[in-house]
Curated annotation (Swiss-Prot):
The organism of origin for this protein: Solanum melongena
Family in the record: Belongs to the cytochrome P450 family.
Gene Ontology molecular-function annotations: heme binding; iron ion binding; monooxygenase activity; oxidoreductase activity, acting on paired donors, with incorporation or reduction of molecular oxygen
Keywords of this entry: Heme, Iron, Metal-binding, Monooxygenase, Oxidoreductase
EC top class named in words: oxidoreductase
Amino-acid positions noted as binding heme in the UniProt annotation, renumbered to this chain: 443
PROSITE patterns membership: CYTOCHROME_P450 (PS00086)
UniProt name for this protein: Cytochrome P450 77A1
Enzyme Commission identifier(s): 1.14.-.-
Length: 499
């Protein structure tokens, strides 16, 4: 019945949307699909997560293949060599973004953000501002005090959580709070002592991510005539609440900038300070409040989920591997003694850095990079890559490729210490793993994220010994996609205070 309905539905859509024939590009191979809807219903009816569907196609179709997802043509790049060719060797051509669906256009203010902007003057201006004026090593040092406060809050929250729940804690919830605390301070220049307010802002940001989830009419736009009214209404409600929540924080910071010394508790600098008068090529005025909301949301969302979920996976792996956890703890004790780990210490900890690198290899934040598109028609592996095609780089597949890694399913930090294997996560010379993307669209917050993960993991291991809950060292590593790749069942852990 499902197949018959799908075929009839495909015919209906075909009659509505058929266009004159044009020269057919030589696309990479892929599974045969139905007219108009392509492989959309095959993916939806497979019972698999999208990354599992892609992973299972790779043995048959190789390292580059095509899916037709309704009106979208999606080209999957699933090898390290082709990722390097596209994003490094042909980086300028592959540096753009495809058209957005209407929901994303609303939240990106028509692509006015670092991640969403097409390759051009808006992207150059916004990215240059973020990298040079906010995420440079010297700027990051200015927020060290906020990171230290957040680390202490993290440890205290875990202590309280453990005391109230027979030594059992939620790993993600506490880590996420600490990361969000840091990013709110960096973005708005305020130290939020009101934990309820922080959690309210955080929940609002989660709601934004939820409404950004793809819908059937994103792939078949003709369906917007018939479905999606309630979802579109929900989108507008969430956007309205997003603006109402963040604009007061924006205006408060604007007042501080315009009246120096008026707020003794305000930070000397914030991301917003760089945005009020940012010069964007081709524009005479600075960003509107709605655009500032978009840029601030990008900063908060981009840094919170990737870091917090990495820590949850990291704690899970240490619980599964007590020997690795103990070796990490001994390194911490050797380097810092009884004092608290700080940012200078983590640079002297090769095993910590190996653990985090292996964590990012085994559990990259997303299955795919943010979608790329090309600025002009180009060939890759002998196939045509047309403009306005969605090019998806299979991050998870690359970091688990047995042709690149020995025993890729094993969590093994020693692979980075023995000289047996190594990888530059920027991918400049060679791509072996790309947790933050590579090339011109590499995540601008890479340096900040690695500092946060290293520091927080070190503090959590220094203060507590972590055990699986319930016991026997069994950890459920089932996963699902919620903007980032998270544990399907949020991690609960039993902790024992060390000091």
């Amino acid at each position: 019945i499902f197949t018959a309905f799908s075929l009839l539905f495909s015919l209906f859509i075909f009659l509505l949307t058929r266009k004159p024939k044009s020269k057919t590009p030589n696309l990479p191979p892929g599974p045969p699909g139905w007219p108009i809807v392509g492989n959309l219903f095959q993916v939806a009816g497979s019972g698999k997560q999208f990354f599992e569907y892609i992973r299972d196609l790779k043995p048959k179709y190789g390292s580059i293949f095509t899916l037709k997802m309704g009106s979208r043509t999606m080209i999957i790049v699933a090898s390290a060599e082709l990722a390097h060719e596209a994003l490094i060797q042909k980086g300028q051509i592959f540096a753009s973004r495809p058209r957005e669906n209407p929901t994303r256009t609303i939240f990106s203010c028509n692509k006015f953000s670092v991640n969403a902007a097409v390759y051009g003057p808006v992207w150059r201006s916004l990215r240059r501002n973020m990298v040079q004026n906010m995420l440079s090593p010297s700027r990051l040092k200015e927020f060290r005090e906020f990171r230290e406060i957040a680390m202490d809050k993290l440890i205290e929250r875990i202590r309280v959580d453990a005391k109230e729940n027979n030594d059992v804690v939620w790993a993600l919830k506490n880590a996420r709070f600490a990361v969000f605390y840091i990013l709110v301070a960096m973005c708005f220049g305020v130290e939020m002592d009101n934990e309820e307010m922080i959690e309210r802002v955080d929940q609002m940001m989660k709601d934004v991510l939820i409404v950004l989830d793809p819908r059937i009419d994103d792939f078949l736009p003709i369906l917007r005539l018939f479905v999606g009214y309630k979802q579109r209404k929900r989108v507008n409600e969430v956007r309205k609440r997003q603006i109402e929540t963040l604009v007061p924080l924006i205006e408060k910071r604007r007042s501080v900038v315009q009246n120096p010394g008026s707020d003794k508790t305000a930070a000397s600098f914030s991301y917003l300070d760089t945005l009020f008068d940012v010069k964007v090529e081709g524009r005479k005025s600075g960003p509107t409040n709605a655009e500032l909301v978009t840029l601030c949301s990008e900063f908060l969302n981009g840094g919170t989920d990737t870091t917090a979920t990495a820590l949850e996976w990291g704690i899970g792996r240490l619980m599964e591997n007590p020997t690795i956890q103990n070796q990490l703890y001994q390194e911490i004790k050797t380097i810092v003694g009884d004092k608290k780990v700080d940012e200078n210490d983590i640079e002297k900890m090769p095993y910590l850095n190996a653990v985090v690198k292996e964590l990012l290899r085994k559990h990259p934040p997303t299955y795919f990079t943010l979608t790329h598109s090309v600025t002009e028609p180009v060939k890759l592996a002998g196939y045509d890559i047309p403009m306005d095609t969605n090019v998806e780089f299979f991050v998870h597949g690359i970091s688990h490729d047995p042709n690149v890694w020995s025993d890729p399913e094993k969590f093994d930090p020693d692979r980075f210490l023995s000289g047996r294997e190594d990888a530059d996560i920027t991918g400049v010379k060679e791509v072996k793993m790309m947790p933050f993307g590579v090339g011109r669209r590499i995540c601008p917050g890479l340096g900040m994220a690695t500092v946060h993960v290293n520091l927080m993991l070190a503090r959590m291991v220094q203060e507590f010994e972590w055990f699986a809950y319930p016991g026997n060292n069994k950890v459920d590593f089932s996963e699902k996609l919620e903007f980032t790749v998270v544990m399907k069942n949020p991690l609960r852990a039993k902790v024992k205070l060390r000091i």
